[in-house]
């Protein structure tokens, strides 16, 4: 608490603007954008995964994955197929028509991860994504993030847990709003099937 995590998350997620300086996402200085422009950036370039999943209870797995597309006013036949393929990619191929109340916590977080990928974002911002999960399910979700990273997707994951951070390639520690540690190290690996080919196929839809 008080480390500056929330401020950093809000900056990276384009929810807040810096009081001075510049903040670039690609070639764009988002610090100079208006609210409508920032809303578009959030919807099209940033995937967000929350600790509490934030799924819509009345919608199915596939319909929840479709939500960012609906907010953008587009949902074509190919978009719908992409959502189905994303659900399958995260291991929910047998639960496409299930609603959140019919899913475990880990399964709900898999829906949230698939939803974060639907617009093929520049990066995924994950805020304590394993905070509500047991240890076994935590490792399953971390393995999924690791596979996505292996497939070329940047993951920015916030955690208080050393057991979680040791699975990252790079660890940045904050204290009182300042970076105390910024180090790269050999990450602990999971014995999972790589999904690079699957993610590439979904992105091509």
Task: Annotate each predicted stretch with a short phrase.
Residues 1-167, 174:
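ABC family nucleotide-binding domain
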Residues 178-204:
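Conserved beta-strand-loop-alpha-helix hinge in the C-terminal portion
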Residues 115, 127, 199-205:
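Generic hydrophobic, helix-prone segments enriched in Leu/Val/Ile
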């Amino acid at each position: 608490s008080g480390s500056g995590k929330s401020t950093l998350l809000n900056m990276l997620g384009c929810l807040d603007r810096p009081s001075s300086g510049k903040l670039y996402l690609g070639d764009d200085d988002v610090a100079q954008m208006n609210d409508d422009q920032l809303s578009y950036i959030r919807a099209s370039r940033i995937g967000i995964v929350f600790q509490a999943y934030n799924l819509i209870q009345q919608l199915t797995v596939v319909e929840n994955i479709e939500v960012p597309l609906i907010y953008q006013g587009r949902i074509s036949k190919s978009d719908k197929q992409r959502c189905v393929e994303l659900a399958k990619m995260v291991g929910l191929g047998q639960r496409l028509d299930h609603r959140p109340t019919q899913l475990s916590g880990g399964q709900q977080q898999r829906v949230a991860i698939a939803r974060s990928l639907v617009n093929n974002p520049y990066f995924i911002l994950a805020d304590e994504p394993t905070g509500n999960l047991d240890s076994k399910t935590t490792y399953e979700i971390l393995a999924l993030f690791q596979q996505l990273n292996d497939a070329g997707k940047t993951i920015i994951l916030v955690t208080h847990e050393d057991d979680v951070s040791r699975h990252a390639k790079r660890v940045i520690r904050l204290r009182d709003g300042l970076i105390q540690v910024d180090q790269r190290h050999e990450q602990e690996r999971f014995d999972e099937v790589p999904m690079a080919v699957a993610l590439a196929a979904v992105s091509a839809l």
